[in-house]
Amino acid sequence: MQNEKGKNWDESRHDAVIIPKMRSKLQKPKLYRVFLFNDDYTPMDFVVFVLKNFFKKSFEEATHIMLNVHQNGVGECGIYSYEVAEMKVIQVRECAHQNEHPLQCVMEWK
């Protein structure tokens, strides 16, 4: 029997290369919680606006979180990967600054 190059093929020889099966261990990304903190100056409507626009919350969800912020001093906006959480914190801080509100937004490792 001949192979594609015309050389004799020895069927008794095993020319197969055995590649060991490697398991790649994918790690789940670390998650971060994003919080808003209450202050005496930021209007409740602005907090709802932030939650709807930057965290994609419904009006009802945003209102519920805003009331948590108002009554408890802090409210959780969501849980995200590091990059997403960091971007949301930056967006909220910039928006608050542009609108002259002292609203504080932070992220914390879960």
UniProtKB/Swiss-Prot annotation:
Biological process, per Gene Ontology: protein catabolic process; proteolysis
InterPro entries: ClpS, ClpS_core, Ribosomal_bL12_C/ClpS-like
SUPFAM superfamilies: ClpS-like (SSF54736)
Known role: Involved in the modulation of the specificity of the ClpAP-mediated ATP-dependent protein degradation.
PANTHER family tied to this protein: ATP-DEPENDENT CLP PROTEASE ADAPTER PROTEIN CLPS (PTHR33473:SF19), ATP-DEPENDENT CLP PROTEASE ADAPTER PROTEIN CLPS1, CHLOROPLASTIC (PTHR33473)
Annotated family: Belongs to the ClpS family.
Database matches in NCBIfam families: PRK00033.1-5
Record note on quaternary structure: Binds to the N-terminal domain of the chaperone ClpA.
Protein name, per record: ATP-dependent Clp protease adapter protein ClpS
Originating species: Bartonella quintana (strain Toulouse)
Name of the gene encoding the protein in the UniProt record: clpS
